[in-house]
Amino acid sequence: MEAADSATNNSKDTHFYGKSRAENRRRSDAMLLLFRALTFSFSLAAVVVMGTNRYRINPQLKVSWYDFEPYRYVLAVNAIICIYSFVETWLAVYTYLQGSYLLPEIFQVWFDYGHDQGFAYLLFSANSAGVAMAQLLQSGNTLIHGAYHCTEAGGYCTQARVSIALGFVAFLFLALSSLLTGLRVARWYLR
């Protein structure tokens, strides 16, 4: 009887910590879905905050996000990340609910990993450019329309910094997604 029980236990496909491969994959899919949804949420918030960043300095003059190229870069990249993470969130929901990939596995694994890496670098680059511009405006080394400091532009500089901070949080979750998809690539080759 004991031999039969041990044979049954040995035939189970278990992974570290007593979890089966299916349980680990489902947990990994759930974490990836969470990271993708958070990336989408924070990048969307960054787009909305930067896109609504307009203030009147005086009755004839207003300052907006499109007056500075780094802020245009921040908005454009966050919009791209927002669209990408929305599509990837949809794919993660499909994978989580169906238990299989929409595309052939090797293609989707490499597609996700490559795009996560590329877009993470792009997002970090855009937010870094935005930080540099925000620091120049805050220090007074660069003036708004060549004559005005941040203090004269209402909450313009603060709102730009909030948008950049939201972009960095989106980068954090995109980097975590990239880590999980990198593990999927490694697992695919280690089978």
Swiss-Prot record:
Q: What is this protein called?
A: CASP-like protein 4C2
Sorted alphabetically, the keyword list is: Cell membrane, Membrane, Transmembrane, Transmembrane helix
> Which InterPro entries does this UniProt record tie to the protein?
CASP/CASPL, CASP_dom
Topological domain, Extracellular: which ranges? 51-72, 138-161
Keyword Nucleotide-binding attached: no
* The keyword Transmembrane appears for this protein: yes
**Cross-referenced PANTHER family, in alphabetical order?**
CASP-LIKE PROTEIN 4A4, CASP-LIKE PROTEIN 4C1
Source organism per UniProt: Physcomitrium patens
Chain segments annotated as transmembrane: 30-50, 73-93, 117-137, 162-182
* Quaternary structure and interacting proteins, as annotated: Homodimer and heterodimers.
